[in-house]
């Protein structure tokens, strides 16, 4: 028996021992994560303690990172000192308690009822009942037509049939042929219909104005009913008598209190609370990566004595010295526990009470602003007396039959009013959609249709979808006309009038009396609201006070913790310098803590993903319709591409995670250097790009259509499956484990001592080795320099200078508009203007675009030659300035030397002779252009237009915060715009289009999406350029032409153009002015005098046009200028002018003797 018991005991001990190290239910990878987290926490504690000893710790940043709040907002919060605010609030609350102590729920209810009745009084005061009594629908309806026709019924029928056919309604083949053939013949009827629109719109306005007055009659009727139902004629005087004493007690609080700004102070405090609570910090941990959870810091003390740490790190050696060194950190951890608790209380209570708290500042502001100079008692007595006098003529009786008759007739007239408004809205929408030029294009295309496959031909017409929208809109007209005619017949026999009801009630005399005796219901309203606010403050104060107390407690614990850490830096530093603290022995402890902590966070994401592997695999089994929806309609290109065949990538992800789990089992049993291989294996897992959050958003918009698939995408949308983005963190973590092992081995005396033996070496060998080392070092230095950013750029520039193509230069010249400007001025033009050879030489050597033009179309070489700056001329020629470039006078730079300078410029004779010799000297020589500097990403100023996806925009601005702005600025380099799937910018907004003519680089919104996936693509803006713009239904492909022209500052497109506006209203005046002036034109502030311009002159780049541009809206008579015999005027509508700009067609005046535009223009 004893033998059996011994055998059984031995078996139990063995079983328990063999399973002691395994945590049931946890994966091997999870257990490695838990164990390495011990090392991560200890390392982070050492790093923070070392920073405290060396006085480099940024304790506020450490705490805010632990709390996961924004450091700036939190610091602003702690700087808040609301002591004065609390004092005012306590004082006000005390007075409010005294004032409302005798009040009850009935008083609060009566206050609400008084406010409602006071609103009716205000309506009676302001209403003109004499006028309302004269309104009669039969009189108005005599002026309204029985029918409302604008288009021929045959045209509406054609459009209805086209709409049905295009939407897929089946027709016989012969009928369908007739339907589409009829499109070719409807042009005349369509334009006839459209021509009637101005008169039709005017008629609608004439109908709608008097008819809408009937709606006001209903409001008047509702007021009369309310006056009767509330019985205010008797109730108001009685209530004023009954509650005068408690009212005056409450109102007295305002009289005995100085006017303050309590509401504004509280609003500022709550705004800071809200910013701090609701704005999260960056998810990337830098100082506390070892403590991802709130309780992790307190675990460090136990980590040092844990079995795993003793076995894998200290390997049985005493940890007492390290425990002693980290005692101050443990005190910090204890103090932080109180901070966490205070923060959680503050955050949770504020989130619960935020809606209520948001209403209190306004309530307090109204109390602060209350008028204390009114004699309340006298006012209430006068109010009651005036009310009784005026309402003695009022009869509180409403005839039931009259009311029923009114409501019946109102329903009939109301249908007519709504019918007219519906037609008016339809006409307004059609007018907005209609574009004459685009319609001409559609009808031209329709006339080309042939009988065979006519529907397919129609569908291929460019932008036919826009035409179809107009057709669909017209199909609504028939039903709108029918509704109108039906409503007219019903209402035409219905007399709508309030004359008898108003007369019977005596409202005319009552309202006149109220107006004459100045009842002043608005002042009573302010008093009633003040009383309401005081009573409400008594209810809300406890919530407000609790939140303020939470804040004070949080601030107290924060300051105590910061003071504790500052104490460590003063006392501990002296002790550490004498004893040699072990926490100071490791180099870059903070870096290792950062790398190891963030590497483990990446492992944690893999663990979470591994738990969801079944759900991940289900995503490969979506039905065909859902897959097609993603491939064809997801707004993000890379997701469409990925979902063409997502299965292999997703299955490989799951397979890689399972392999990592399998290898973790063997790693756990080995030493630290073997365990770290989990990071190396993890870094090889690529994963998949972020797709599920975007797909989930796509499915969410479809309602229940993809409910089964959405359960999967919802579950996966929170997972980070793009493990390739964590490769750097995992690799860094692996290297940090190596360094940490060396540190701990040295700390615990585990490093083996190496014996050193001396050997004699030949001096010749030593010399040869030294020479070889020097040569190797020189070669390595040259090669190594090439791996630095400066070296790489310099080597690339050398290559481009000797072997580069024009296209290579063009890629960099795209940024010349921004690279070559200082304080908004081009550095070349400015250097010549200032005669600054030093700055000019610096600019050309760093590759500034050398043929840039000033606003007069002259290059720097033209200006330098014209002014006789021979040293500047030589610098420009020797650095590749184009000597054949023609300015707007069709002169080369050399031709800018005055012909008779010996007579006209005697003081510059030597200068011009020197310049002539320079041109002769280098006439047959060509010079290379210097390589333009690469425009750094850090100098990007990116502005994102409002129509882009809000989620993508917010993520992008967060990720690239330093180079993005939510404000448009003169320094903006890139403008991200919403484009179609074809990459076309569609907009009629000149405030957005102005960026094209400003010279900013216009990029598609898909750039943001791809940059979020791979931030290196921020440098590849050239792959996302917008090349086409659709304005007023027409597509133009000159966007990049404008960018390049502005980058190189070519001859201004509108040089010699003088613009005058002939419009009653120009909503885009500021944008048009900026475009015109930016392109070298002149915006005139008054109508031009033709005599000030030379006959026969033209803008330099538009010899086919007159120099005076008149922009008009088509309303004025401009035939005199249109038929000008001298062809000095060119007339444009705003759209035609933009068409000129977008086409960017140039007709250069090649005449060697250009006629100046202005009579007094200088050469």
Swiss-Prot record:
InterPro entries: Ankyrin_repeat-containing (IPR053345), Ankyrin_rpt (IPR002110), Ankyrin_rpt-contain_sf (IPR036770), BRCT_dom (IPR001357), BRCT_dom_sf (IPR036420), WSN (IPR003125). Keywords: ANK repeat, Repeat. PANTHER family: ANKYRIN REPEAT-CONTAINING PROTEIN F37A4.4-RELATED, ANKYRIN REPEAT-CONTAINING PROTEIN F37A4.4-RELATED-RELATED. This is Ankyrin repeat-containing protein F37A4.4. ANK repeats lie at residues 856-885. It comes from Caenorhabditis elegans. It holds the Pfam family Ank_2. SMART domains: ANK (SM00248), BRCT (SM00292), WSN (SM00453). SUPFAM superfamilies: Ankyrin repeat, BRCT domain.
């Amino acid at each position: 028996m004893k033998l059996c018991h011994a055998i059984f005991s031995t078996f139990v001990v063995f079983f328990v021992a063999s399973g002691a190290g395994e945590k049931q239910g946890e994966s091997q990878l999870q257990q490695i994560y838990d164990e390495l987290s011990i090392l991560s926490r200890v390392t982070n504690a050492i790093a923070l303690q070392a920073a405290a000893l060396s006085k480099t710790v940024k304790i506020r940043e450490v705490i805010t990172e632990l709390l996961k709040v924004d450091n700036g907002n939190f610091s602003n919060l702690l700087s808040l000192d609301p002591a004065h605010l609390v004092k005012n609030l306590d004082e006000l609350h005390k007075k409010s308690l005294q004032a409302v102590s005798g009040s009850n729920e009935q008083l609060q209810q009566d206050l609400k009822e008084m406010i409602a009745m006071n609103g009716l009084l205000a309506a009676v005061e302001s209403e003109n009942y004499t006028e309302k009594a004269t309104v009669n629908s039969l009189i108005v309806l005599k002026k309204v037509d029985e029918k409302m026709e604008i288009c021929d019924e045959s045209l509406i029928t054609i459009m209805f049939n086209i709409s049905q056919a295009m939407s897929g309604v089946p027709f016989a083949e012969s009928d369908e042929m007739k339907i589409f053939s009829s499109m070719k013949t409807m042009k005349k009827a369509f334009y006839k219909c459209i021509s009637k629109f101005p008169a039709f719109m005017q008629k609608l306005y004439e109908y709608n104005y008097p008819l809408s007055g009937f709606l006001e009659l209903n409001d008047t009727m509702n007021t009369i009913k309310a006056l009767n139902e509330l019985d205010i004629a008797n109730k108001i005087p009685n209530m004023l008598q009954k509650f005068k004493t408690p009212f005056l007690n409450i109102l007295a609080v305002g009289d005995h209190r100085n006017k303050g700004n309590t509401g504004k102070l509280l609003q500022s405090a709550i705004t800071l609370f809200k910013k701090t609570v609701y704005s999260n910090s960056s998810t990337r941990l830098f100082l506390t990566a070892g403590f991802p959870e709130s309780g992790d810091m307190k675990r460090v003390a136990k980590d040092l004595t844990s079995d795993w740490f003793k076995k894998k790190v200290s390997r049985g050696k005493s940890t007492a010295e390290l425990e002693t060194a980290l005692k101050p950190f443990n005190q910090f951890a204890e103090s932080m526990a109180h901070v966490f608790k205070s923060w959680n209380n503050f955050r949770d209570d504020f989130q619960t009470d935020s809606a209520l708290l948001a209403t209190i500042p306004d309530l307090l502001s109204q109390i602060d602003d209350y008028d204390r100079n009114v004699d309340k008692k006298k006012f209430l007595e006068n109010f009651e007396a005036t009310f009784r006098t005026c309402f003695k003529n009022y009869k509180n009786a409403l005839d039931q039959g009259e009311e029923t008759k009114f409501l019946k007739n109102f329903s009939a007239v109301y249908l007519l009013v709504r019918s007219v408004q519906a037609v008016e809205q339809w006409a307004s929408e059609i007018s907005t959609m209609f574009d004459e030029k685009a319609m001409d294009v559609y009808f031209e295309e329709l006339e080309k249709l042939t009988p065979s496959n006519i529907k397919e031909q129609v569908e291929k017409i460019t932008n036919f979808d826009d035409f179809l929208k107009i057709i669909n809109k017209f199909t609504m007209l028939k039903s709108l006309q029918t509704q109108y005619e039906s409503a007219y017949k019903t209402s035409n026999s219905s007399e709508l009038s309030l004359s008898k009801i108003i007369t019977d009630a005596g409202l005319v005399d009552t309202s006149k009396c109220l107006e004459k005796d100045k009842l002043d219901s608005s002042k009573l309203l302010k008093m009633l609201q003040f009383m309401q606010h005081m009573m409400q403050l008594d209810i809300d104060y406890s919530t407000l006070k609790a939140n303020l107390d939470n804040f004070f407690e949080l601030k107290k614990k924060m300051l105590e913790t910061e003071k504790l850490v500052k104490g460590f830096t003063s006392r501990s530093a002296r002790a550490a310098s004498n004893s040699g603290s072990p926490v100071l022995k490791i180099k870059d402890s903070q870096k290792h803590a950062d790398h190891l902590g963030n590497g483990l966070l990446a492992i944690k994401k893999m663990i979470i993903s591994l738990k969801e592997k079944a759900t991940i695999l289900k995503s490969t089994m979506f039905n065909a319709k859902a897959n097609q929806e993603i491939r064809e309609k997801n707004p993000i290109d890379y997701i469409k591409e990925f979902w063409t065949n997502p299965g292999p990538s997703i299955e490989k992800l799951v397979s890689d995670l399972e392999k990592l789990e399998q290898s973790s089992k063997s790693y756990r049993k080995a030493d630290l250097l073997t365990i770290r291989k989990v990071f190396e294996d993890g870094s090889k897992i690529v994963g998949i790009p972020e797709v599920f959050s975007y797909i989930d958003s796509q499915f969410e918009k479809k309602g229940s259509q993809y409910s089964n698939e959405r359960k999967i995408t919802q579950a996966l949308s929170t997972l980070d499956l793009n493990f390739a983005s964590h490769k750097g963190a995992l690799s860094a973590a692996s290297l940090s484990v190596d360094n940490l092992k060396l540190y701990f081995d040295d700390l615990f005396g585990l490093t083996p001592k190496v014996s050193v033996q001396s050997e004699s070496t030949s001096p010749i060998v030593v010399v040869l080795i030294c020479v070889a080392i020097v040569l190797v070092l020189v070669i390595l230095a040259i090669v190594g320099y090439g791996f630095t950013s400066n070296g790489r750029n310099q080597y690339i520039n050398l290559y481009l200078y000797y072997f580069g193509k024009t296209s290579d230069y063009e890629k960099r010249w795209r940024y010349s508009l921004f690279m070559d400007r200082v304080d908004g001025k081009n550095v070349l033009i400015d250097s010549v203007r200032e005669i600054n050879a030093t700055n000019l030489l610096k600019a050309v050597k760093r590759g500034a675009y050398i043929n840039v033009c000033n606003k007069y179309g002259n290059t720097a070489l033209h200006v330098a030659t014209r002014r006789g700056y021979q040293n500047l001329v030589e610098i420009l020629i020797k650095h590749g300035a184009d000597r054949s470039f023609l300015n707007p006078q069709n002169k080369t730079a050399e031709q800018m030397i005055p012909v008779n300078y010996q007579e006209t410029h005697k003081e510059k004779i030597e200068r011009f002779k020197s310049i002539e010799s320079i041109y002769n000297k280098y006439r047959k020589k060509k010079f290379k252009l210097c390589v333009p500097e690469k425009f750094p990403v850090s100098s990007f100023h990116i502005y994102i237009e409002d129509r882009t996806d809000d989620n993508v925009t917010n993520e992008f601005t967060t990720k690239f915060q330093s180079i993005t702005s939510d404000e448009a600025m003169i320094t903006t380099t890139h403008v991200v715009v919403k484009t179609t799937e074809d990459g076309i910018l569609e907009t009629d907004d000149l405030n957005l289009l102005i960026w094209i003519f400003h010279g900013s680089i216009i990029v598609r919104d898909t750039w943001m999406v791809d940059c979020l996936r791979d931030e290196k693509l921020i440098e590849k803006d050239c792959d996302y350029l917008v090349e086409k713009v659709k304005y007023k239904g027409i597509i133009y492909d000159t966007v990049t032409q404008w960018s390049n022209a502005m980058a190189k500052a070519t001859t201004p497109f509108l040089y010699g153009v003088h613009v005058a506006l002939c419009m009653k209203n120009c909503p885009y005046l500021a944008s048009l002015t900026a475009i015109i002036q930016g392109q070298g034109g002149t915006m005139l502030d008054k109508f031009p005098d033709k005599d000030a311009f030379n006959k026969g002159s033209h803008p330099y780049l538009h010899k086919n046009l007159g120099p005076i541009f008149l922009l008009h809206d088509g309303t004025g008579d401009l035939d005199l200028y249109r038929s000008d015999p001298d062809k000095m005027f060119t007339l444009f509508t705003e759209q035609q002018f933009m068409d000129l700009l977008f086409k960017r067609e140039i007709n250069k005046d090649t005449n060697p003797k250009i006629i100046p535009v202005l009579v007094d223009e200088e050469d």
